[in-house]
Amino acid sequence: MNKKELTNKYKQTIQPMGIYQIKNIKNGKIYIGSAKDMRGIINSNKFQLKHSLHSNKELQNEFNEIGEAGFSFDILDYLKSKENLNYDYTKELKLLKDMWLEKLHASSV
């Protein structure tokens, strides 16, 4: 397969979606996020934090103070797909994220 075919195949595949957490091990504070593509979200957050690019300034400040070793990055839940490439999962992800925010008394990423 050439690059264009691989790109088209990727676009025709439903990616794993769900909820993740970034936890400050030192103070126990939890940040919850959702993603339509879970495969790269942890690495994306780590990259942003390491390069002081994260949009959550409170999380960024904590990361700058204690470093990566002071945090855990975990997948909390996956959203079951409907096998429809055109379906918009935004509402379902928001509901699932809100449930985890309430359950863990956490902040949003």
Predicted features by range, described:
Residues 1-32, 36-109:
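Structure-specific nucleic-acid interaction/processing domains
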